[in-house]
From Swiss-Prot:
PANTHER family: UPF0398 PROTEIN SPR0331 (PTHR38440:SF1), UPF0398 PROTEIN YPSA (PTHR38440). This is UPF0398 protein lp_1753. Belongs to the UPF0398 family. InterPro entries: YspA.
Length: 189
């Protein structure tokens, strides 16, 4: 069994503001290609969080890949109870829809948000309950994933825990490949 934690930037950090944004199409294309390789190499659990951005897009891509790879399991772990409860109705509905579709979901802390320790406990849970991590993150462009990046690097100093970064160069290569396939008449919808 191989369990992959995948996280990364929030949607606003990537300037993606809508499901029809061309940047989102490229990100999902890159995630699909990457996760397909991971599945074919033995990953059977894709574990992500519920944050708006890479985490929710990862869950969406994982659910789509289950049609081709029914053995794949998708889990969403949330840092605390009532996660997303302060979001607008549309974002709350998107989260609830994803939670209803994944194979497993649970909060690491059942309590609503109380303090930053819950976020640290969430990170610790994720690294100790997965076999590897992938971050859509570029260390030259810090953001929210910096905390996960630092924790994973420290954890991997004392544990066999591989980290893969999907950085902006990787995303640019994916954008080029996506554009080339579109120009050749390949339909991604």
């Amino acid at each position: 069994m191989s369990r992959l934690w995948l996280s990364g930037y929030r949607s606003y950090e990537l300037n993606v503001f809508g499901d029809q944004d061309d940047k989102l199409k490229v990100i999902k294309f890159a995630l699909t290609n990457y996760l397909t390789t991971q599945i074919e190499d033995g990953m059977d659990w894709l574990i992500t969080g519920g944050q708006l951005g890479i985490e929710q897009w990862t869950a969406e891509v994982g659910l789509t890949l289950k049609k081709t790879y029914p053995e794949l399991k998708v889990a969403m772990m949330l840092p605390y109870g009532e996660f997303g409860g302060r979001w607008n109705e549309n974002n709350q509905a998107k989260l609830q829809t994803l939670l209803a579709q994944v194979d497993f979901h649970a909060p690491v802390s059942k309590q609503p948000y109380e303090n930053p320790q819950q976020l640290k406990n969430y990170q610790e849970f994720m690294v100790t309950h997965t076999d590897a991590a992938t971050l859509v993150y570029d260390p030259d462009n810090p953001g929210k994933p910096t905390y996960d990046y630092d924790l994973i690097r420290n954890f991997s100093d004392t544990h066999p825990y591989p980290l893969t970064l999907i950085d902006f160069d990787w995303l640019q290569e994916s954008a080029n490949e996506y554009a080339e396939k579109q120009n050749n008449g390949f339909n991604f919808e």
